[in-house]
Amino acid sequence: MKKITVTLFLLLFANSVYSQKKPLDHSVYDSWKSVGSISMSDDGTFITYTVREQEGDGYVEVLNSKTLEKKSVQRAEQPVLTPDGKYLIASIKPFFAETKEAQRKKLKPDQMPKDTLGIYNCLTGELVKHPFLESFKKGLYGNKYIAYQTKMPADTTKGKEPVKKDKKAGSDLMVFHLESGTTDTLKAVSEYSFSLGGDSLFVVRRPGLQDSLLDAGLFMYTPKNKELRTIYTSDSGQTVKLPVISQDNRHLAFLVKPDSTKTGNDSASIFYYTEGFPSAEVLIENEHIKDGWQISDNREPVFSKSGHRIFFGIAPVRPVKDTTLLEADIARLDIWHYRDNYVQPQQLVNLKRELEKSYLCVADLGKEQEIRQLAQEEYPQVHVPCEHDADWGYSVSDYNYQLESMWSADPRADLYIINVTDGTSELVLKDHYISNVGASPEGKYLVWYNNLDSLWYSYNRANKKIVCITPDMPVSFANELHDTPEMARSYGYSAWAEGDKAVYLNDRYDVWQIDPSGQTPPVALTEGLGRREEITFRIARPDYVVYPPGVRRLEKETIKAGATVYFSAFDEKTKENGVYYTKTARRKSGKNDAMKACIKEPMTFNDLNRSTESGVICYIKHNFENSPDVWITKDKFKTQQKITDINPQQKLYNWGTAELIRWKSTFGRELEGILYKPENFDPARKYPMLVYFYERNSHTLYTYKSPAPSRSTINIPFFVSNEYLVFVPDIIYREGHPGQSALDCIVPGVEKLI
């Protein structure tokens, strides 16, 4: 009798808890947060991540992975953690409500609330602020210095005449030493950037009227000894761009162009500076370029990895703009012809890109100037492997097939190999359906996938032979779930082995180690475990450095012999996700280690980050019932520690569950879908049901969905919380019958549920 009483009490208590939970309404959206932008110090001690509200004030949190102590910097965005983990630099936004009120009052941009620079000491917890922030930068690997500029808000005092300023003039640049807290000021700076190591700061100076005694041009500032070195002194009206730096930090190159606002021409010259030069010298001018062409300022120069070559762009000279005519007197006319490669609306969309298009050229440093044009009209995009150090380049061109791209989903292309040493080219493939074209890191091979025969091929640069590298394979490399009226694409490739000895190709489930020369038999890096267990493995690079935009790092790091390789894992049967790992073969053994599972759970894992000097792994984990939160592991997932709880308010609401449903279509195919049910679901009740469908979605069974308005999908948490069922069925399309296919897949699934 006591057992019955206790059971009855627990049931009544559970029901009362469910009944106390509120349904979601539209007022709750702003309280829901998201987490992302994970960064980690090299030794794994400090981890930072950003927490954002849909509308509101977010923050950056700093975690000490050893003590699990957390500190937050309120309203911080764009966080940058120094590699040694000592400092976090971020832009601190104004209060959201303050910005919203300023927008409501329709204030001018210079009257809007300004950002603040925040410099947070991760060791002491001290936060230093510098108001009215306009921008800040740091060397990618730098630990000591940052630079920033501020902009004072407009003076809105009544009756006071605004001070007229030269809009092109530079402003003060502050160079801040993180350890000492001291600041150096550089005047009239319009642009600036650090070297990767952060030891040198390059500034473009453009003095205004108040700084008329200062020289304009490009300068290099060394914060350690406070030395400002002149690289180039510019004339009035010239525009000087920030330099590109060779990987050995010995060479600089930059563009200088005259004032082109009146003529519409973007002619430029390339200047060069290296150790021992008193100042920069002209390297390439338009007189070195063929008639009718000029150096383009729309393509930044780039040094080859060795620093022996420089690559840049040229473009046809455009007609000089007649500045004597008024805009109203200039006739504007768009002419279209039925044999144009693109229809007129697309031509207009592409106009800016076409006007800025340039063609790749190369010149050797230290030799008499010989400009070699690599790109041509027939193949306008040329890629040079080995970080521009290879003696060859390649181009995949649809030049001869652009017209048919308007109606064909399977575009054809030609493949060219270009000799970098003399600019000549060779057509190695004509009229082929190719994709996933890419060169090996050391430039020995070029690989591609043939969409027509579903095979991978390689081009050997040494002997110029093309071989099929996946003949007679027991698996297909074409998308096995492909169901649209076009050729099936491949699953791509993940990485290269050190020395270009292997390329890692993906099939539906496994990763294959393939010899690009075609001589060594293929080896399944994942041992065929994926196909046996129906688990999709993909190489993950949690310790791979993600370089910010603008940093030239063209090749991913190769996988070395004996290296530990991590894989993301997705179980097609259960929809669970996880992480596996193996070790590649050492040179002597010649055999890879067995696959080992770190973890597999009914969850989704995102943003895996591994410290470069320790075994700390930080990641985001979630499923439909559990909001995305930050977790860490120090022992390859044997134990996990949850770090955040960003949406505790979810417990107050009637949430939901996600369940995998299986059925057969009317044409006999096995299908899957997701049924979302309210948390307080009662199987004895009847519920209204919504059906949302779009291709396949069953793989998202363990994916969180924030309550939020959407223009394209339905708000599943909202409807489930308000006691609707939501059914999301997969659809398998049959060619030529999309509507009937959807009907044949969806209706049987709905009938099974009702």
Positions of PLM-derived features:
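Bacterial Sec-dependent N-terminal signal peptides
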Residues: 1-22
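Generic low-complexity, intrinsically disordered sequence content enriched
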Residues: 12-16, 529, 723
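Intrinsically disordered, low-complexity peptide-like regions
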Residues: 13-14, 23, 458, 607, ...
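Serine-hydrolase catalytic core recognition
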Residues: 600, 604-754
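Beta-propeller folds
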Residues: 19-611, 615-616, 622-628, 632, ...
